Regions:
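Basic, polyanion-binding surface patches
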Residues: 1-111
């Protein structure tokens, strides 16, 4: 029973093809001090130019100063309506318990 995590992407996402091709995926839970970074990735084609990150052993970029960084291996994709669901096995997880997560709820940030 390896730990699993899942997420979904809209089939219109500019990043969809990258995730479909990837065997290893990085998942980052941003801190409440990273609102600008969240908006950057939400509104632009994701490019890592000025984003501070580190690489995992699998060469997956992880965003520095996040609350959680999860290094995953993709094990399954499921078509569901206008989204594609990714199920991933967690290989390694890094948690900073001193930080609070960034939460987006009902079309606004909760800081």
């Amino acid at each position: 029973n390896p730990p699993l995590v899942l997420f979904s992407l809209d089939k219109k996402s500019t990043s969809l093809q990258l995730y479909k091709k990837a065997n290893h995926i990085g998942i980052n839970i941003l801190s409440n001090k990273q609102k600008d970074l969240s908006e950057y990735f939400a509104n632009n084609k994701p490019e890592w130019g000025n984003v501070k990150y580190f690489l995992t052993n699998n060469d997956i970029p992880m965003i520095k100063n996040s609350v959680v960084n999860i290094d995953c291996e993709k094990i399954k994709m499921i078509n569901q309506g206008d989204h594609l669901i990714f199920i991933c096995k967690v290989n390694k997880i890094k948690i900073d318990k001193n930080k609070k997560p960034l939460i987006y709820l009902n079309s606004k940030y909760i800081l």
